[in-house]
Amino acid sequence: MAAGGTGGLREEQRYGLSCGRLGQDNITVLHVKLTETAIRALETYQSHKNLIPFRPSIQFQGLHGLVKIPKNDPLNEVHNFNFYLSNVGKDNPQGSFDCIQQTFSSSGASQLNCLGFIQDKITVCATNDSYQMTRERMTQAEEESRNRSTKVIKPGGPYVGKRVQIRKAPQAVSDTVPERKRSTPMNPANTIRKTHSSSTISQRPYRDRVIHLLALKAYKKPELLARLQKDGVNQKDKNSLGAILQQVANLNSKDLSYTLKDYVFKELQRDWPGYSEIDRRSLESVLSRKLNPSQNAAGTSRSESPVCSSRDAVSSPQKRLLDSEFIDPLMNKKARISHLTNRVPPTLNGHLNPTSEKSAAGLPLPPAAAAIPTPPPLPSTYLPISHPPQIVNSNSNSPSTPEGRGTQDLPVDSFSQNDSIYEDQQDKYTSRTSLETLPPGSVLLKCPKPMEENHSMSHKKSKKKSKKHKEKDQIKKHDIETIEEKEEDLKREEEIAKLNNSSPNSSGGVKEDCTASMEPSAIELPDYLIKYIAIVSYEQRQNYKDDFNAEYDEYRALHARMETVARRFIKLDAQRKRLSPGSKEYQNVHEEVLQEYQKIKQSSPNYHEEKYRCEYLHNKLAHIKRLIGEFDQQQAESWS
């Protein structure tokens, strides 16, 4: 810790500020929060330090520690104050501090030096003296209040109150039932209904109460807390409000208000007991704006004819998030066909990979599925969750901050290691056209082949597969059986030979058309690549850090759930590979996969939304962390 100069800053006077390290790299700047007892002990020591042979000391033990301040009477005793260490950005994400030291030169000129960011805070714990002092103050306040309420008030006295009119009893009443004279009679049903509604809401989960309030309007944190307290809030729930807001809401840095995240709107209940009729109508309008646009877009696209051109590259950001190397077991039919027909193939010296060409050529497009708009190819800056970027390492003890002190790397997504686990089992439950499983890292053509070629090739493949169904399983004749590895290799070689013998005009047209659709003008960047650009100031760096902290906990929770689901199928896939196809053990594992799929489908109905949200947050946080690391590295180089 560094102590400032003895002088103070004067009004209407200019000071120079130095932001260099001045060769003092061993200085650690901390924000210290003292209790009144600790301040009084320090002041006593300062006034008698020439008479006290001992000096104050501070000891750190992890995130806790002890401060010892010698007493002046008796001299051999000390004050002991426990403290704990916390991160400033995590406790107060809306602001940060710089430590400024005022020094004086030999000529008497004042100079201000910036010693660095205050990233950690020491909070001294209260002692018995603090509690005793608080009790004494409360007793004194109660005594003053009691004296004030029993004192005889005289005209012109210090506690002159308002006059109270005493109603006189009516002398003559014509009506024999005086109760009828009551004005504005109250309906007891309304009172009972309000009381019942309030008690019902207070018993609901605290998170549900928060999201149903944020669904109607944006709230600042104090406003939201005051609104929640009207229906009753216990101390435990009050302390968890910050963590809940980080999970379900976005913070507006301009007015510090919170708005509900889009994916949470699906959890809202239209019959929430705390809503009035006006609130319910308002909720309906909000839900129609949030949930219906995607349905309208899907309905419009079904009526359009499929056209393979560069215009197909324009699509919504939500559909772009579907592109992932991990084939999960809960992918629905429309989304699967849409994103598999629009992946960009790997290129070798500017030419398409033959394997990818073959895979794309063999995709039959049903009328309904073919009309689904195609998402654009991902830009080079898009980072799939299966291949996370290498992020700047750091040496910190706080996992929630994206830079320097207090950083842990984002977890690598292990659930993407086996990209095509049980893709065919998934086809059985959705009755889709069979798509060959691609090896990890390979992707499909963005534009499909011309419809005539697609139709002819899909017709040939359907004949081969229909024979296979009759031989293997008459019961599941409409489903697609698992394609064995040897048969895949043989068919792949046959299709490659057909492609090589095809006319150069047709293949060139496809390549040329797909190349045109991949031009940069048709690529839509993720929103975080547009919002978060290179950092040029410390204020911008702090804003990025706050955004990182606001979504980090949500990402960790989603990542843990996705990884748990993926590990089940990876384990079963490893068992399947050790067994011979057609054996009883192989069939048992196959049935186990189908049962596991049904369990996940029932227990996690929002699995797809959570998975895409997890991928999006991973790429966004990695991008923010990289920008902060680059900025810190630039600052370190400028100081050296």
UniProtKB/Swiss-Prot annotation:
Keywords: Nucleus, Phosphoprotein, Transcription, Transcription regulation, Ubl conjugation. Pfam families: ELL, Occludin_ELL. GO terms for biological process: positive regulation of transcription elongation by RNA polymerase II; snRNA transcription by RNA polymerase II; transcription elongation by RNA polymerase II. Residues 184-202, 291-318, 391-401 have a biased composition (Polar residues). InterPro entries: E3_ELL-like, ELL/occludin, ELL_N, Occludin_ELL, WH_DNA-bd_sf. One of its GO terms (cellular component) is transcription elongation factor complex. Residues 471-490 have a biased composition (Basic and acidic residues). GO terms for molecular function: cis-regulatory region sequence-specific DNA binding. Residues 172-202, 290-320, 343-490 are annotated as: Disordered. This is RNA polymerase II elongation factor ELL2.
